[in-house]
A protein has these predicted regions:
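Viral virion structural and adsorption modules
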Residues: 1-161
């Protein structure tokens, strides 16, 4: 299945549609099919790849257009990439043209030591433009951690868009 992002006149992704591979033999064929079936202009259907995230891939292949397009993402025609929604990221965060994602001016989130993993967390401080290490009011117990089906969610590491 080939996937195409429908973009508006401001290059914002409205939705992602699927087209059978035998129809979308290349991007132009998929665009023509979508224009014919939806009435939306072919030039506003942009092929995307669900395996691409932060300019890398989950399956070891080559990244395609920076990120898999999501609703609200921005299509950058000059860079030929999809930018994620800035979402809750603070005003100081900028576009990283290597990862095609938003990044703090202080860089990536520092790692916690193994001893700190269940007792501390990082929070962005927009006033100082730095990561601030804080201690949980109620630390996570090892039993809670071991029982959690999603460790990243438990530790607050899931990115919210």
């Amino acid at each position: 299945m080939a996937e195409f992002a429908k973009i508006d006149e401001n290059n914002i992704v409205l939705r992602v549609d699927h087209v059978e591979d035998n129809i979308a033999t290349d991007e132009a064929a998929g665009q023509a099919h979508l224009e014919e079936t939806t009435g939306w202009p072919a030039a506003q259907w942009i092929m995307t790849d669900k395996n691409t995230h932060r300019n890398g891939t989950l399956n070891g292949g080559s990244p395609f257009r920076g990120n898999y397009a999501g609703i609200g993402y921005e299509w950058d025609p000059s860079e030929q990439v999809f930018w994620p929604i800035k979402g809750d990221n603070p005003a100081s965060w900028v576009k990283n043209t290597t990862t095609y994602d938003w990044e703090s001016p202080a860089g990536l989130l520092p790692d916690l030591t193994d001893d700190e993993l269940l007792t501390h967390y990082w929070r962005w401080d927009e006033g100082t433009l730095q990561w601030e290490k804080l201690e949980y009011a109620t630390p996570i117990t090892q039993a809670e951690y071991d029982a959690a089906p999603d460790k990243d969610e438990l530790l607050g590491r899931k990115r919210k868009y």
